[in-house]
A protein has these predicted regions:
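Short linear sequence motif anchored by a di-proline
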Residues: 1-193
Length: 193
């Protein structure tokens, strides 16, 4: 488990950032939990700003069924398989939150304290006529470290366009994400014992 392996998505708040949302995308792809291999909503650069599209989560590995679902911010530029995506096909993955499991396989939900949507940095590329994406991860901050040593690279709302700017990308790759709110199912269950 390398960090961020399931995300939760709801549409309403994303419409405030991306004005031109295809209603078909809205109905089909904001259904709740999204897993690797699922099609997920993504935000990408367009002529008029930012636009919403969909993309399948996970780069296929050549030897079989396994997928690469995350890319480390610290080493992404050194990996030939990621180079084209990070340089030319950066995207944002909007989500209401994401799930992470601790060493005891207990599920934790992470979301923002201050906003209903978090924006994860990522990139995509083409594999046999199909576009696929990965989510960028970075070292866990204080809000995450007790559960996992990695976390998604989360951008602030004011940085969304910066992610598509080659001059600002490198700085974003090294930033520490915002502190997140954690809700743990196992802690909630224990209240009712």
């Amino acid at each position: 488990n390398k960090g961020c392996s399931q995300i939760l998505c709801k549409a309403d708040e994303i419409e405030k950032v991306v004005h031109d949302i295809d209603q078909r995308i809205r109905q089909e792809h904001f259904a709740g939990d999204i897993f690797p291999t699922n099609v997920a909503p993504i935000i990408e650069k367009s002529e008029h700003g930012l636009k919403l599209d969909v993309c399948k989560w996970g780069y296929p590995l050549s030897q079989g069924k396994n997928l690469v679902i995350n890319a480390r911010a610290e080493s992404v530029m050194d990996k030939p398989s990621f180079r084209n995506g990070i340089l030319y096909h950066r995207i944002l993955i909007p989500a209401s939150g994401f799930y992470e499991w601790n060493r005891l396989k207990e599920k934790n939900t992470f979301s923002r304290y201050d906003a209903p949507v978090l924006y994860m940095a990522g990139f995509c590329d083409w594999f046999e006529n199909e576009r696929r994406f990965v989510i960028m991860t970075t070292a866990a901050n204080e809000s995450m470290i007790k559960v996992h040593d990695r976390m998604p690279l989360i951008l602030e709302k004011g940085q969304l366009k910066d992610w598509f700017d080659d001059r600002k990308m490198e700085q974003i790759l090294h930033q520490v994400p915002v502190q997140l709110k954690r809700e743990a199912e196992y802690e909630q269950q224990s209240l009712f014992l």
